């Protein structure tokens, strides 16, 4: 069994990232810790005026093959793997001295291979061999050895040494061991993912298959959740190892109760929808569906218009804004309705002050970022569905007018607005909109015509006028009945992908009703 506290007398430092190296080395030397090192790390320590012994001097074997072979030696690995109370005699027989602390980070394979001009040779030269081997040796022997893999760990490491007269606890050694094995797993996964995606080893800058023969995913736990989608399910939230800037996983919670599984799922839907707009916008989401979306002169205006779409569904909803939330809008929201989560790229001081009056409201800040997820995944029984993310936009120039009447300029603007919203509504999705605000949303129905009828019903419940509005459909109309239902509600223009066997009948129906219709040639199913 591991002793609780063990002293650090000898440390091996070998790092690619020199952040914090000299401060760490200086603190260790001040505690009379003997330093061993390699290559550029030893050079940096020596130039700082600190004593250090080269590993080559220890092993009696020089670094060779342009640094490919440096630490793969029994005097190094024996010093890391030797067990207290078991291996002392063998170590003494072979002149192996124990190493108590390993500080090591790996060649920057991930940051090199993310570059678009990375050659296969560049990638291969940044595959670390000796580093992972040492990490595994040290991490396996956490009963005696401590291992640090990240400059972010140095401060806590030194603090524990300071607090315990140069010793590290068993708990600290074990925690560092787990982190080291995680780092090795992440590193090996990155190498496997890269090489599995390389289509042709003969290419200088190889083409990468977006769907390689094997994928290895790494996620880091952010938090445990109160429960999963339902109270009888347990749950936790994990983020990508390298989250895309501007996506939900980069959030900072400023106040409120702990987040639930459903909070996060709904927050992601709301945030992804609102961040596609340039002008001030508000999106209100319930059960992963937008129930109100609007663009306005400011956050307050956008909120009022979005809320008016469906005040009933907005109760207990998730509200997302794409601009800094001001105090007046925060007050209007919190005085009017129960809110589960507020999301914005930032908040002014007054908004945050007022939010504290509703201490349970979860307030999330997500920094601006233009990054987009490259892939969507969905778990099925013992399998994973993977696809490129639906990041397809739409511009006026891509629309095809298929009816006798072309949409007016105002209708075109509303059509594109409704199309953007429909992309985030569960299929079958129908969105009625006018003046850059939703009038009614029909979501998740097995029949497209029923979704159209629901959109009209929601508008009627909210006492909003459908006449003169436009309609967006996430997929084509298989029959003319959807157009007939829209016409009876007062819809004047329609945007849809087209592509049905009965497009001719659908277009004829639109012409009969004097409806302008455009095809996008793009479908936005969402399940």
From Swiss-Prot:
GO terms for molecular function: IMP cyclohydrolase activity; phosphoribosylaminoimidazolecarboxamide formyltransferase activity. Keywords: Hydrolase, Multifunctional enzyme, Purine biosynthesis, Transferase. It comes from the Bacteria. The keyword Hydrolase applies. Its EC number is 2.1.2.3, 3.5.4.10. Pathway: Purine metabolism; IMP biosynthesis via de novo pathway; 5-formamido-1-(5-phospho-D-ribosyl)imidazole-4-carboxamide from 5-amino-1-(5-phospho-D-ribosyl)imidazole-4-carboxamide (10-formyl THF route): step 1/1; Purine metabolism; IMP biosynthesis via de novo pathway; IMP from 5-formamido-1-(5-phospho-D-ribosyl)imidazole-4-carboxamide: step 1/1. GO terms for cellular component: cytosol. Residues 1-149 form the MGS-like domain. The lineage of its organism: Bacteria, Pseudomonadati, Pseudomonadota, Gammaproteobacteria, Lysobacterales. It catalyses: (6R)-10-formyltetrahydrofolate + 5-amino-1-(5-phospho-beta-D-ribosyl)imidazole-4-carboxamide = 5-formamido-1-(5-phospho-D-ribosyl)imidazole-4-carboxamide + (6S)-5,6,7,8-tetrahydrofolate; IMP + H2O = 5-formamido-1-(5-phospho-D-ribosyl)imidazole-4-carboxamide. InterPro entries: AICAR_Tfase_dup_dom_sf, Cytidine_deaminase-like, MGS-like_dom, MGS-like_dom_sf, PurH-like. Signal peptide: none annotated. The gene is purH. This is Bifunctional purine biosynthesis protein PurH. One of its GO terms (biological process) is 'de novo' IMP biosynthetic process. The IMP cyclohydrolase activity resides in the N-terminal region. CDD domains: IMPCH. Belongs to the PurH family.
């Amino acid at each position: 069994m591991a002793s609780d506290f063990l002293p650090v007398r000898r440390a091996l430092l070998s790092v690619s990232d020199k952040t914090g190296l000299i401060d760490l080395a200086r603190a260790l030397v001040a505690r009379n810790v003997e330093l061993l090192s390699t290559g550029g790390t030893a050079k940096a320590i020596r130039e700082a005026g600190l004593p250090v012994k080269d590993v080559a001097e220890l092993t009696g074997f020089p670094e060779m093959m342009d640094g490919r072979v440096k630490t793969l030696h029994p005097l190094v690995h024996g010093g890391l793997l030797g067990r207290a109370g078991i291996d002392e005699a063998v170590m003494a027989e072979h002149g192996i001295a124990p190493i108590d602390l390993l500080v090591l980070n790996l060649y920057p394979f991930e940051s090199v291979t993310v570059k678009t001009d990375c050659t296969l040779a560049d990638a291969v030269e940044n595959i670390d061999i000796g580093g992972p081997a040492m990490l595994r040796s040290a991490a396996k022997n956490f009963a005696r050895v401590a291992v640090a893999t990240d400059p972010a760990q140095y401060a806590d490491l030194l603090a524990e040494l300071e607090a315990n007269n140069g010793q590290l606890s068993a708990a600290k050694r074990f925690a560092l061991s787990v982190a080291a094995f995680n780092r090795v797993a992440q590193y090996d996964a990155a190498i496997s993912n890269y090489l599995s995606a390389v289509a042709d080893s003969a290419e200088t800058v190889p083409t990468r298959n977006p769907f390689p023969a094997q994928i290895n995913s790494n996620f880091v736990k952010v938090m445990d959740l109160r429960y999963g989608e339902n109270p009888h399910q347990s749950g936790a939230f994990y983020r990508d190892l390298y989250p895309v800037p501007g996506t939900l996983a980069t959030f900072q919670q400023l106040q409120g109760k702990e987040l639930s599984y459903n909070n996060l799922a709904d927050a992601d839907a709301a945030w992804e929808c609102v961040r596609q707009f340039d002008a001030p916008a508000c999106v209100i989401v319930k059960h992963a569906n937008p129930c109100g979306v609007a663009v306005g002169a400011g956050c307050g205006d956008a909120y009022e218009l979005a809320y008016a779409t469906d005040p009933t569904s907005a109760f207990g909803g998730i509200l997302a804004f794409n601009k800094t939330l001001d105090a007046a809008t925060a007050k209007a929201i919190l005085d009017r309705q129960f809110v589960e989560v507020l999301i914005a790229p930032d908040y002014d001081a007054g908004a945050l002050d007022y939010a504290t009056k509703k201490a349970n409201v979860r307030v999330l800040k997500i920094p601006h970022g233009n990054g987009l997820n490259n892939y969507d995944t969905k778990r099925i029984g013992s399998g994973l569905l993977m696809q490129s993310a639906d990041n397809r936009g739409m511009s006026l120039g891509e629309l095809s007018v298929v009816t006798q009447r072309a949409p007016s300029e105002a209708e075109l603007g509303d059509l594109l607005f409704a199309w953007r919203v429909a992309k985030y509504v569960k299929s079958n999705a129908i969105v009625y909109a006018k003046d850059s605000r939703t009038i009614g949303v029909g979501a998740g129905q097995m029949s497209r015509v029923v979704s159209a009828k629901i959109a009209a019903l929601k508008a009627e419940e909210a006492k909003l006028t459908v006449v003169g509005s436009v309609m967006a459909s996430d997929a084509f109309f298989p029959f003319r009945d959807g157009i007939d239902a829209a016409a009876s509600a007062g819809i004047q223009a329609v945007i849809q992908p087209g592509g049905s066997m009965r497009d001719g009948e659908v277009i004829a129906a639109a012409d009969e009703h004097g409806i302008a219709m455009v095809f996008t040639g793009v479908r936005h199913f969402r399940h």
